[in-house]
């Protein structure tokens, strides 16, 4: 590690920070930032965060699995993979449009700004199901919410049709760094993922792209993932930081939980190298204490998934999230999901 890099990372003046949107990071720089003393790292990330964002603006996003299970990919962390029979996840068809929009309306009433829809596909096929997804996107936008979908790999024409339907953002995570990637997934290449992100960007849709920590990767692998994201121009509009939820029946079922401070470091490093991105504290947040979550917010996280499930895994209860956000000074409407039904 370079002491010079650490010194520069911790001493740069706030005025310079405001101008410092970079796409030429090196792996050594990112790893040095990640490995700074924790208090210095959180302070540095908080300085960058406040230079570019309103610290009281924490976006709430709801996430719904609109088509569950039976995915042909072999992602080692995912219970929706058809390869992982031991996960015992029922395979379900695509939800009806009206049922999805009812969920979106309830999420909006409960304070969500963005509604995200996930389908367990390798790639969507043109036809009735893709047309239904387009209708869902139009419906969510009609409710006055941001709309995000994650459907797997896209063609350029599919990305363009989603853009025309009003899609705000497309989620397609890198999951990890390119060197470790092959240990987790064999059915889709890293370049496949990057190609879909390029299609999304060319269509004018916002990019939502992040990864997972706690799968057995090294700190270097985490830094490599952030390097790929930070050197894309422009930066992703949002960067989900997930902690592995080890699900029984998947190849990673026995992975131990990560140290919550690892999530703090990832949020802080992502904030420093991508100053204006939404850093989204995502899967695995349920295992964090209130204090650990607040530390992530201080380190630059400014978005959470709001609701009791994230696709197929448990999330914090909406009431608990509302109480937490109010306690740190974030306005949340006094409405519950039950009241919205």
From Swiss-Prot:
HAMAP family: BioB
Pfam families named among the record's database cross-references: BATS, Radical_SAM
A molecular function GO annotation: biotin synthase activity
Binding site residues for [4Fe-4S] cluster: 71, 75, 78
Family named by the database record: Belongs to the radical SAM superfamily. Biotin synthase family.
Enzymatic reactions: (4R,5S)-dethiobiotin + (sulfur carrier)-SH + 2 reduced [2Fe-2S]-[ferredoxin] + 2 S-adenosyl-L-methionine = (sulfur carrier)-H + biotin + 2 5'-deoxyadenosine + 2 L-methionine + 2 oxidized [2Fe-2S]-[ferredoxin]
Enzyme class: transferase
Subunit structure: Homodimer.
Function: Catalyzes the conversion of dethiobiotin (DTB) to biotin by the insertion of a sulfur atom into dethiobiotin via a radical-based mechanism.
Superkingdom assignment: Bacteria
Gene3D superfamilies: Aldolase class I
Binding site for [2Fe-2S] cluster: 116, 148, 208, 280
Cofactor note: Binds 1 [4Fe-4S] cluster. The cluster is coordinated with 3 cysteines and an exchangeable S-adenosyl-L-methionine.
Biological pathway: Cofactor biosynthesis; biotin biosynthesis; biotin from 7,8-diaminononanoate: step 2/2
EC number: 2.8.1.6
Listed cofactors: [4Fe-4S] cluster; [2Fe-2S] cluster
Gene Ontology biological process: biotin biosynthetic process
Descriptive protein name: Biotin synthase
Keyword list, A-Z: 2Fe-2S, 4Fe-4S, Biotin biosynthesis, Iron, Iron-sulfur, Metal-binding, S-adenosyl-L-methionine, Transferase
Organism: Methylorubrum populi (strain ATCC BAA-705 / NCIMB 13946 / BJ001)
Domain Radical SAM core residues, every copy: 56-285
